[in-house]
Amino acid sequence: VHGILGTDNSKRDIWSGVIAGVKWAMLIGLLTALVSVSIGVVYGVISAYVGGWKDSLMQRIFEIFISVPMLPVLIVMSAVFKPNIWVMIGIMCIFYWVGPVKTVRSMGLQIKEETYIEASRALGASNTRIIFKHMVPLLIPYAFASMALNVPGAIVVEATLSLLGLGDPNIVTWGQILQDAHNGGAMLSGMWWWVVPPGLAIAFMGMTFAFVGFAMDKILNPKLKTR
């Protein structure tokens, strides 16, 4: 056994793999969270602003997406198509955008009744300008909190798919290291250093962003401070 965390059965340094996995974990988590939350915030604001039958239609579409289980779809898509990290991120974005919609819509319904929104409409401001100039900026703090809470989910989903052998084999992720450890019989051979470090890395990264998200949520929602 050599190196800080030892080597696997192919003499690859585990520490180097764990460090390389940080880059991909951050990319997968942050990119998925950024794209999905941005879509969800804009969708929720538009739904709240337009109202009427358009709002009802948008909410029915939202309910269809939120009722579809993401992980089975990801497993099927990864099995049908060649495993690719960008396809995986794209599919996660398709399902993750529904997360903030309900909360954003309820906040948007309150914002659109504000006096300055009515004044902007009376002065002839377009709906697009009102939505993106006056409403969306007020939801940016909530969007950041939502992003922080979405990052752990994206990292865990990628690790799950990689552990099942459906991840991108061309990149080094923590899930891919665990999959290699499983195939290499690490647990049967007692090679705990091949399994524990990437597992702890996933847990640590997930907890870090989760705590950041909870802290931001408490700041944005004073009612949570009393709990």
What are these regions (language model features)?
Residues 7-227:
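Alpha-helical transmembrane segments of integral membrane proteins
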